[in-house]
Amino acid sequence: MSVSDLRQSYEKGVLVEEQAAASPFQQFARWFDEAVAARVPEPNAMTLATVNAEGQPSARIVLIKGYDDAGFVFFTNYESRKGLDLDANPRASLLFFWQPLERQVRIEGVIEKVSAAESDEYFHSRPLGSRLGAWASRQSQPITRDELEAREREFRDRYGEHPPRPPHWGGYRLKPNRFEFWQGRPSRLHDRLRYEPDGKQGWTIDRLSP
């Protein structure tokens, strides 16, 4: 079978303005809860797209660790490629794809670091191996497997079961200025609703052509 022959009909839901929440944060929470209830694998997995100072885009899967009306929070190494991208250009985009529900959510906005206290709280909730890994990994830098495991042993010997949060590791919050909710429909006539600020502490909702 050719790649061009692969196709699927989308028939699992609809998205209409009359049923959409007035707030995109409420609409996201509704869909996220439905993804969890449907046992979508890792419903908190999202694609994070960033752009560096030269305009070169890059994308990777990360896990959301919190969301509310202030934004969407994730944690990473500040010296990683995405961290360096965000230092140069704080504009970014998130994409959630819940394939079993034939839904995706795209969120655009500006990213800022969370407080040290918020980063500390989450870091100390992680399994020990993950905390030591944050020290061992010079994320995005070349390394051999033997070197990586030697660094993990080094920091395990140094900190035991109580490693502090590395200064190069912490959280970011994306503060949204645009949402798009996509629901697959038959004949590729998909539902797309875009939310943008209305300038009055609310949001406008527009239907986009599929």
From Swiss-Prot:
Its cofactor is FMN. Substrate binds at residues 7-10, 65, 122, 126, 130, 188-190. One of its GO terms (molecular function) is FMN binding. It catalyses: pyridoxamine 5'-phosphate + O2 + H2O = pyridoxal 5'-phosphate + H2O2 + NH4(+); pyridoxine 5'-phosphate + O2 = pyridoxal 5'-phosphate + H2O2. Keywords: Flavoprotein, FMN, Oxidoreductase, Pyridoxine biosynthesis. The keyword Transferase does not apply. GO terms for biological process: pyridoxine biosynthetic process. Pfam families: PNP_phzG_C, PNPOx_N. Its EC number is 1.4.3.5. Homodimer. NCBIfam families: pdxH (TIGR00558), PRK05679.1 (NF004231). Catalyzes the oxidation of either pyridoxine 5'-phosphate (PNP) or pyridoxamine 5'-phosphate (PMP) into pyridoxal 5'-phosphate (PLP). This is Pyridoxine/pyridoxamine 5'-phosphate oxidase.
